[in-house]
C-alpha cells in the first residue's frame, strides 16, 4: 500500500511493507548512503537536498527525510524534516490525520473501494487545481464558461477515485445541501466542457455517466474513453476547470 500527502507545509509518502519484511535492510541502506541516523528507532533519518542529489539527481525530493516504523510495517518520507516528524507521529497514532476531519471522512464514505484515489481536504483544491495556474487568456475563457454554466460556489473538499472497473467518481463537497444542488448542473457541464489551460475538452477523455447530489456533495461519475492509461495523474494538478472555486 502506498499513500502520498501534500500540504502547504510539505509533502510526504507512506509505504506499508508486508509482514515479515526485514526493516534492517532499509536502515542499513540509509546508513550506507550517508543519512544521519536518528537517536531513536522511530526517529527521522536526515538526508537533505545535497545528499539526495549526490545519490541520484533524479530522485524525488520527498526522499530527503525518512522514518522507519518497523512495528507498524511503515516507511514515511518527506521533503521537509519537520513534516517528516509530523507525518511519522500521525502514522504512529500520535497526531491528527485526515481521518479525524469530518468533511474528509464524509467524502470518503461516499465511495466504493477504489483502485486509486486523490483527496483534497477543506479548500486545498481551490489553490492546487486553480485556474490561476493558467495564462490570462485561459482564465478569461474559464470565467466565461463558468458564467454560461450557471456559476459555482467554492469547494470545501474534493475527491477523485478510480474504481477497478475504470469508472472515475468525482465528489465535490460544499457548505450545505443547498449549495450542492446549485452546483450540480454547472459542475456536470464543466466536467464535459472545454478545458482551458489544458487544451481540448474534458469530453475528449471522459463520458459523463451520472450526476447527482448526496447531502452537501455533488457526485459525478465519468467513464474514460480509453481502455488504459493513467487517468488520475492527468487531473492531479491544475488548472482543472470543473474543480474551480
Regions found by a protein language model. Give the residues of each.
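Soluble, non-membrane globular domain cores that form compact, hydrophobic packing
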Residues: 1-10, 16-245
Amino acid at each position: 500500500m502506498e499513500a502520498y500527502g501534500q500540504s502547504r507545509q510539505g509533502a510526504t509518502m507512506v509505504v506499508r511493507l508486508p509482514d515479515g519484511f526485514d526493516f534492517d535492510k532499509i536502515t542499513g541502506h540509509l546508513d550506507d548512503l550517508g543519512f544521519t541516523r536518528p537517536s531513536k528507532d522511530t526517529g527521522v533519518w536526515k538526508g537533505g537536498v545535497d545528499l539526495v542529489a549526490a545519490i541520484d539527481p533524479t530522485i524525488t525530493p520527498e526522499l530527503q527525510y525518512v522514518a522507519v516504523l518497523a512495528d507498524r510495517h511503515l516507511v514515511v518520507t518527506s521533503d521537509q524534516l519537520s513534516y517528516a516528524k509530523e507525518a511519522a507521529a500521525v502514522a504512529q497514532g500520535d497526531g491528527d490525520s485526515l481521518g479525524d476531519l469530518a468533511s474528509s471522512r464524509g467524502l470518503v464514505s461516499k465511495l466504493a473501494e477504489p483502485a486509486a484515489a486523490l483527496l483534497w481536504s477543506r479548500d486545498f483544491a481551490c489553490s492546487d487545481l486553480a485556474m490561476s495556474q493558467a495564462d490570462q487568456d485561459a482564465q478569461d475563457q474559464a470565467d466565461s464558461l463558468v458564467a454560461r454554466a450557471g456559476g459555482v460556489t467554492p469547494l470545501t473538499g474534493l475527491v477523485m477515485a478510480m474504481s477497478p472497473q475504470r469508472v472515475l467518481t468525482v465528489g465535490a463537497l460544499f457548505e450545505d445541501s443547498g449549495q450542492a444542488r446549485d452546483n450540480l448542473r454547472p459542475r456536470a457541464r464543466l466536467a464535459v466542457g472545454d478545458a482551458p489551460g489544458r487544451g481540448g475538452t474534458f469530453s475528449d477523455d471522459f463520458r459523463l455517466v451520472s450526476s447527482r447530489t448526496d447531502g452537501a456533495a455533488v457526485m459525478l461519475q465519468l467513464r474514460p474513453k480509453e481502455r488504459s492509461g493513467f487517468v488520475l495523474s492527468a487531473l492531479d494538478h491544475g488548472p482543472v476547470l470543473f474543480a474551480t472555486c
